Amino acid sequence: MASFHIRQFQERDYEQVVDMFSRGMKEHIPTAFRHLLLLPRTLLLLLGVPLALVLVSGSWLLAVVCIFFLLPFLWFLAGQPWKNYVSKCLHTDMADITKSYLSDRGSGFWVAESGGQIVGTVGALPVKDPPSGRKQLQLFRLSVSSQHRGQGIAKALVRTVLQFARDQGYTDVVLVTGLLQQGAVTLYYSMGFQKTGESFMDILTWLVDVSLIHFIYPLPSS
């Protein structure tokens, strides 16, 4: 098992960070596709449309061709939310990581480095409108290279954010992750995060039934 250390993001890390983040998000597309195929409305579409064509035209060949056209469309539909999310991030906070995360004492961005390579990332920003009496920090961009998973890197990165939050006087750490990101969901539960709700990012994520899970980690008061 290769050793790693966690440090603050530096500008020279940018290309590696963005590349790892983008690839990590797009890795979820096959899972999203399988999830979409098992939805009742998808099964109805895959069975109903070809059957309707057979009843209207009497051609089974046309029905088979229809299925072959529907499957690439469903792949596109499953992948689009992830691609849209990556594009949005690269045009907002990830466009300038230093400006977004390192221009204020109450925020931060860290990388895990191993053998001179960036193998993990995590960021944190203060919540703009927290509940009354709370000071909350939101965890963002947790990602670990596929070749370095299972080594405790993600857990170490989350602990870095939790310790930073304690040092800065935050009352809670909050985050949002996708239902299909089961590795992340399991990690957060195992570290003591509590689920506070679910939501959908937009109509497309609702259509493909990819919900977002909201978590909170209350920090003990000093």
UniProtKB/Swiss-Prot annotation:
Reactions it catalyzes: L-lysyl-[protein] + acetyl-CoA = N(6)-acetyl-L-lysyl-[protein] + CoA + H(+); an S-substituted L-cysteine + acetyl-CoA = an N-acetyl-L-cysteine-S-conjugate + CoA + H(+)
Keywords of the record: Acyltransferase, Endoplasmic reticulum, Membrane, Signal-anchor, Transferase, Transmembrane, Transmembrane helix
Parts of the chain on the Cytoplasmic side: 1-35
InterPro entries the UniProt entry points to: Acyl_CoA_acyltransferase (IPR016181), GNAT_dom (IPR000182), NAT_camello-type (IPR050769)
Cellular compartments annotated: Endoplasmic reticulum-Golgi intermediate compartment membrane; Endoplasmic reticulum membrane
Superkingdom per UniProt: Eukaryota
Residue numbers on the Lumenal membrane side: 57-222
Membrane topology of this protein: Single-pass type II membrane protein
Pfam families associated with the record: Acetyltransf_1
E.C. numbers: 2.3.1.-, 2.3.1.80
Functional description taken from the UniProt entry: Endoplasmic reticulum-membrane(ER)-bound lysine N-acetyltransferase catalyzing the N6-acetylation of lysine residues in the lumen of the ER in various proteins, including PROM1 and BACE1, using acetyl-CoA as acetyl donor. Thereby, may regulate apoptosis through the acetylation and the regulation of the expression of PROM1. May also regulate amyloid beta-peptide secretion through acetylation of BACE1 and the regulation of its expression in neurons. N(6)-lysine acetylation in the ER maintains protein homeostasis and regulates reticulophagy.
Protein name according to UniProt: N-acetyltransferase 8
Lineage of producing organism: Eukaryota, Metazoa, Chordata, Craniata, Vertebrata
